Amino acid sequence: MRQKMAVFTGRLEIIEYPGVVVREPVLLKPIYVYIGDLERSIIEGLLPLNPPVVLGSFGVARVIEVSGSNTEYTGRVFTVKPFGDHGILGVEVDGLLANYTSIHPSYLDDVLLDPKPIDSIKPLIKHSTSIAMESLEPVLIEGCGLTALLTGLALRYIGVEPAYYCEQSSKLVLQYGFTIYKHIGDVVEKWGSIVLTSINQASKYKLTTRLDYKKLIISPLSFTQCIPLKKRESLFSINIFSRVSSEESSVVNKVSSDLAKIIRVVEVEDLKNILGLLPPRSPGFILSLK
């Protein structure tokens, strides 16, 4: 049983071992892996990390073997989320872009009986929906990547129409008819919530220092290390990466249906075939590993 992995070493490489290297308790065989904003940021050198690291933060995988406890997971298919005990999967610890990989059990999410490609993005949809549920009106979303779009769609489904601040490409969000600000001078000053989703530090700095808001919501996927803040009477900083409740599942399903219309699925028989597909264009794609 040979192991192939898409590893970022300063550049993207496909590394092959004659056997399977198991570093974490849960050995997985990935089935679907979503490739999107995080992988693009890493490959283009926009997101600093300590290489080498196996890419792939979101996906669906079958558990092949478990060491220690949780042996009941063996043979089951799970969605895999990027949030766990050891940092962000595919960025701070080895991810899913491999024919076999091992992870800590804290990254396993839902058990799937009939896995579909769109399930690979369900953890991101759930994360974005959780952010939407925590937001106070009016809502300004910083960034125009997939996390930002999904948060906006979830807000729309619960009756809140957000606005966006995007210094870079806004094409993905624009096609859904949201209000988009491109220049800080055009942005309305007072907001209920500002949601930070991008890795653009300059963008986040402008919003948090120049605008008034009651609540600041920070996605861990924005890799926000620190933010200079003005003194305010009421300010909260929140990292949201919890599971969604059953109350939110209808919103998750609606957003999933929307996303399935714009995300393509690419089948590959060998990981070497993905090199020409990376870095991915927005909104990314789902890799189906045979």
Q: Model-found features: residue ranges?
A:
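NAD(P)H dinucleotide-binding glycine-rich loop of Rossmann-like/cofactor-binding domains
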Residues: V80-I141
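Glycine-rich beta-strand-centered segment in the early N-terminal region that forms part
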Residues: V20-Y34, E44-G84
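C-terminal hydrophobic helical "lid"/dimerization subdomain
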Residues: L140, V244-K290
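Structural motif
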Residues: K81, I141-G145, Y165-Q168, L196-Q201, ...
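Extracellular beta-rich ligand/substrate-recognition surface
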Residues: M5-E13
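Glycine-rich cofactor phosphate-binding loops and adjacent beta1-alpha1 units
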Residues: L136, L174-N239
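Mid-domain Rossmann-like dinucleotide-binding core that forms the NAD(H)/NADP(H) cofactor-binding site
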Residues: K116-E189
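Extreme N-terminal starter segment of soluble prokaryotic enzymes
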Residues: M1-Q3
